[in-house]
Design a protein with these regions (language model features):
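Extended active-site neighborhood of metal-dependent phosphoesterases/phosphodiesterases
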Residues: 1-90, 109-132, 139-177
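Short acidic, glycine-rich surface-loop motifs adjacent to enzyme active sites
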Residues: 89-106
């Protein structure tokens, strides 16, 4: 199955249709805009916490002409939900999945990542049980572990863009695209 999350391109259209597609496809799993899934296999447990990152970024909430649904989401309620999920997560692996990166080697402006660091990133670092944050948005592959951090930040997206010179960041382990 595909465990889906919305991204900025979905917010240009009918975001509820992305959620509702779960009723059409047996492979598409997205019961709501943010949700959790526990997978157990061979004695190992994995908790996926899938989040809707577009409403966490101020520029999307402010641009209601292009992203009409972003300003209607209660992003603080979502962050509170993530905090509660992480407070009780006891699985062997805890992986948080969203569309936008918290850290990235890119030439894109920093405002989105600064918003992500101040919102979701703050909560992830508060809890010592998060193993990995997986996202897309940048259109290449990256692995980052910030110095002193225990979370692996993985950007796993369609490598449709060649890597352009971006601002070097501490902790970049790998970048290809």
């Amino acid at each position: 199955p595909w465990y889906a999350v919305c991204g900025n391109h979905e917010y240009r259209g009918n975001t509820q249709a992305v959620v509702d597609y779960s009723t059409v496809s047996s492979r598409w799993r997205m019961p709501s805009r943010y949700y959790t899934k526990v997978i157990k296999e061979n004695g190992t447990t994995l908790r996926l916490i899938l989040v809707d990152t577009t409403p966490l970024i101020a520029s999307y909430r402010a641009d209601s002409a292009v992203y009409p649904d972003a300003c209607h989401q209660d992003w603080q309620a979502q962050l509170d939900w993530v905090d509660r999920q992480l407070s009780t997560a006891k699985e062997d692996w805890v992986v948080v999945v969203g569309h936008h990166p918290i850290y990235a080697y890119t030439n894109k402006g920093e405002n989105e990542r600064m918003d992500m660091q101040a919102t979701l990133g703050r909560i992830l670092r508060k809890h010592k049980n998060v193993d990995m944050y997986v996202c897309g948005h940048i259109h290449n592959f990256q692995h980052i572990r910030k110095p002193g951090d225990t979370i692996d930040y993985v950007i796993n997206s369609s490598p449709s863009l060649s890597r352009k010179k971006g601002k070097d960041i501490d902790g970049i382990k790998f970048c290809a695209g």
